[in-house]
């Protein structure tokens, strides 16, 4: 079968031939439909994130996938059922407390592998196998965009955890801001716009730009951070009740605290490389304590977040899905899915269709 992988000798994505996998007991065989490409895939390729499976000379890429059950293998799934796979798996097949309680997304380093990212092959192949417990049903009506379930699940978890910090009191947020106008940021912006009176999105793009067009269509305010840095949002626009960071730009973590309103919460999802810079720690501490602000980090997601994401996917407007997916390519031309450019928002590798 055809797979897209990265080898220890090559930097870019490679079209490889590998044997079709056979499912173990408790696993199903899935025929892949589409796999999305995101920033993490680029980080895996350049070696700044993730790692190869033990002893392997290559790793199959891809963690945003949708497929069709080819062989249920006695799992209780049905042949022809559309599913989206979660990402984290038990390390070396051995369970631990995080997997036993259904919270693999809360496991520390070394207590998990991640398909297509850390220590385990991904889904960018014509077929893959997975334990049935990690396959989430997706309605056929949205199968074409089922690869978005994984990124949507990341936001479902981030929002859940951020809002949980405000549950002890009567929090009445009106304004939300997304830092980053990539595909994840734009999906999140639409989600937040359904909840908040006013929404903003911070980016670094000149008009005309397709991502800014989406921001405008959603009805949000675009903020160019070259003109208005994040910590100047309160003066230029307003202090924010909720800030969702999806840039990986390290200063944004600290600028978020300044940009939050009284009782506000910020959630960090970007993964920056090491970067030393000066921070006024006293003022930062003061802002958090005296104004009841909160800053949290979150990564990955689990089955319940995938299930919530499936519901959200069914609510996304057709125009947003059409505008968001800018490249659909086959495995033979996978390089197109990894090209960076101002017109590229969300790229997809298509292996098959329903």
From Swiss-Prot:
Family the entry assigns: Belongs to the zinc-containing alcohol dehydrogenase family. Glucose 1-dehydrogenase subfamily.
Protein EC: 1.1.1.47
Recorded GO MF terms: D-glucose binding; glucose 1-dehydrogenase (NAD+) activity; glucose 1-dehydrogenase (NADP+) activity; NAD+ binding; NADP+ binding; zinc ion binding
Protein name (record): Glucose 1-dehydrogenase
InterPro entries: ADH-like_N, Glc_1-DH_arc, Glu_dehyd_C, GroES-like_sf, NAD(P)-bd_dom_sf
Region (Disordered): 1-27, 91-110
Function description: Catalyzes the NAD(P)(+)-dependent oxidation of D-glucose to D-gluconate via gluconolactone. Can utilize both NAD(+) and NADP(+) as electron acceptor. Is involved in the degradation of glucose through a modified Entner-Doudoroff pathway.
UniProt entry tagged with the keyword NADP: yes
Residues that hold Zn(2+) according to the record: 38, 63-64, 150
Source organism of this protein record: Haloarcula marismortui (strain ATCC 43049 / DSM 3752 / JCM 8966 / VKM B-1809)
Cofactor: Zn(2+)
Transmembrane segments: none
């Amino acid at each position: 079968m055809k797979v897209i992988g990265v080898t220890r000798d090559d930097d870019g994505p490679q079209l490889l031939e590998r044997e079709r996998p056979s499912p173990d007991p408790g696993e199903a065989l899935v025929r892949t439909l589409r796999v999305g490409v995101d920033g993490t895939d680029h980080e895996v390729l350049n070696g700044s994130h993730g790692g190869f499976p033990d002893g392997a000379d290559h790793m199959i890429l891809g963690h945003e996938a949708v497929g069709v059950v080819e062989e249920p293998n006695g799992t209780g799934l049905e042949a022809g059922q559309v599913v989206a796979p979660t990402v984290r798996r038990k390390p070396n097949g051995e369970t631990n407390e995080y997997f036993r309680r259904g919270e693999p997304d809360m496991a520390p380093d070394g207590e998990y592998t991640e398909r297509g990212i850390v220590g385990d092959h991904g889904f960018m192949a014509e077929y893959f196998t997975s334990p049935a417990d990690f396959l989430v049903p997706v309605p056929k009506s949205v199968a074409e965009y089922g690869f978005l379930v994984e990124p949507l699940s990341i936001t479902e978890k981030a929002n859940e955890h951020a809002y949980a910090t405000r549950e002890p009191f009567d929090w009445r947020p009106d304004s939300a801001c997304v830092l980053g106008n990539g595909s994840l940021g734009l999906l999140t912006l639409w989600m937040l716009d359904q909840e908040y009176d006013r929404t903003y999105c911070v980016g670094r793009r000149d008009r005309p730009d397709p991502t800014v067009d989406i921001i405008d269509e959603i009805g949000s305010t675009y903020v160019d951070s070259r003109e208005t840095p994040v910590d100047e949002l309160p003066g230029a626009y307003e202090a924010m009740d909720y800030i969702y960071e999806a840039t990986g730009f390290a200063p944004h973590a600290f600028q978020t605290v300044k940009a939050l309103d009284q009782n506000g919460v910020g959630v960090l999802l970007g993964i920056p490389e090491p970067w030393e810079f000066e921070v006024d720690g006293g003022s930062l501490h003061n802002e958090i304590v005296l104004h009841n602000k909160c800053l949290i980090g979150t990564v990955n997601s689990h089955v319940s977040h995938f299930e919530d994401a499936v519901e959200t996917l069914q609510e996304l407007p057709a125009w947003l899905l059409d505008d968001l997916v800018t490249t659909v390519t086959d495995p033979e031309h996978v390089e197109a899915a990894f090209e960076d450019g101002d017109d590229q928002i969300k790229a997809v590798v298509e292996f098959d269709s329903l």
